[in-house]
């Protein structure tokens, strides 16, 4: 059986970019709290940030969604043209996320084969949804991606690993030389540390 989770090219901001302002929470969070996103916008200001290249779902009902999508795509192209990114080729990132309570959650960043994914209830596909998909949110998500030169996935995949042999084993395989980022997240989001896997 082919595993639908793979190594890929991962873009990260080059050194000198403020990672705290660059990294924002997923677009499907705080969907009824406009004040959260207003504060993020205020914090980011004119700095490079993923805030400028995602469509927070709190804005989905706004009349200016089409304009926002156009601006997102323009900004993505600007970031690429301005050479903001370093490319980590054919790799995965082992991640340690410390939340605001101090609890550490470990994870792995890579690429998922969307042909193996099915969000329909009762699906037996290799990759399937653990919660109900809000169908109405799919069209604007797809529309953002039509002309987008960058992908900003924000999904979390749960894996069957009863013996804890995958994620847990990685912490013993990385060293301080493998660290590609290590910073506090904005808005009391905790801390994140990423290690490039060789």
Task: Give short role names for the model-derived ranges.
Residues 1-191:
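N-terminal extension/subdomain marker
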């Amino acid at each position: 059986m082919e595993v639908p989770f793979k190594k890929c090219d991962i873009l990260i901001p080059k050194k000198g970019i403020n990672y705290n302002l660059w990294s924002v929470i997923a677009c499907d969070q705080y969907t009824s709290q406009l004040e959260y996103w207003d504060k993020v916008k205020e914090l980011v200001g004119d700095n490079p940030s993923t805030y400028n290249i995602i469509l927070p779902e709190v804005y989905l009902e706004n009349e200016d969604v089409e304009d926002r999508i156009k601006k997102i795509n323009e900004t993505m192209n600007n970031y690429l043209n301005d050479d903001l990114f370093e490319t980590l080729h054919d790799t995965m990132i082992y991640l340690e996320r410390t939340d605001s309570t101090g609890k550490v959650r470990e994870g792995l960043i890579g690429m998922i084969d969307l042909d193996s994914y099915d969000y329909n209830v009762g699906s037996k596909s290799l990759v399937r949804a653990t919660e109900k998909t809000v169908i109405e949110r799919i069209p604007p998500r797809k529309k953002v991606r039509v002309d987008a030169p960058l992908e900003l996935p924000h999904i979390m995949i749960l894996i069957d690993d009863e013996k804890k042999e995958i994620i847990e084993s990685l912490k013993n395989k990385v060293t301080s030389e493998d660290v590609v980022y290590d910073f506090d997240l904005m808005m009391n989001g905790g801390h994140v540390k990423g290690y490039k896997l060789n």
